[in-house]
Amino acid sequence: MQQFREAIESGDLDAAVALFADDIVFRSPVVHAPYQGRAQVEPLLRAVARVLEDFRYTCQIGDPEGADHALVFRARVGDRELEGCDFIHRGEGGRIAEFYVMIRPLSGQLALAEAMRQQLAPSESTGA
């Protein structure tokens, strides 16, 4: 999981996406249905990277050789502070197969949801 953490912290999104399984499942903190497949998850990761300011991981939980990890983070959306956790499961071949995000407090989660809606609205309206 260290490779993923380092890729995110350095802003190397190409390296982070390269660690995703083709059939990755991403569970958003604000959308009920999961996103499935690298083609759906990659644009979300890139949008989140544009929206979250001062993003930093503060804690990593899990056996480095194990399949399941939790990466605790802090960030900001505008004037809203938030903290959250990325729960990550590595599947066969060590690729990230499941990615589940939780965020608190509600005010931070709502600010993130609105900022993400604005980021993704143009591509949704054009069908891209």
Task: Indicate residue ranges for each PLM-predicted region.
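Short acidic-aromatic low-complexity motifs
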Residues: M1-L19
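Exposed alpha-helical structural elements
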Residues: Q3, A15, Q40, G108-A111, ...
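A general structural-boundary detector
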Residues: Q3, S28-V31, A75
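Hydrophobic pocket/interface hotspot
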Residues: F4, A16-V17, I24, G37, ...
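Short N-terminal micro-motifs specific to bacterial/archaeal maturation
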Residues: A7, V31-H32, F87
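A solvent-exposed, acidic/Ser-Thr-rich amphipathic alpha-helical stretch
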Residues: L13-A15, L19-G66
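A beta-strand edge to alpha-helix "cap/lid" segment located at domain peripheries
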Residues: R46-A128
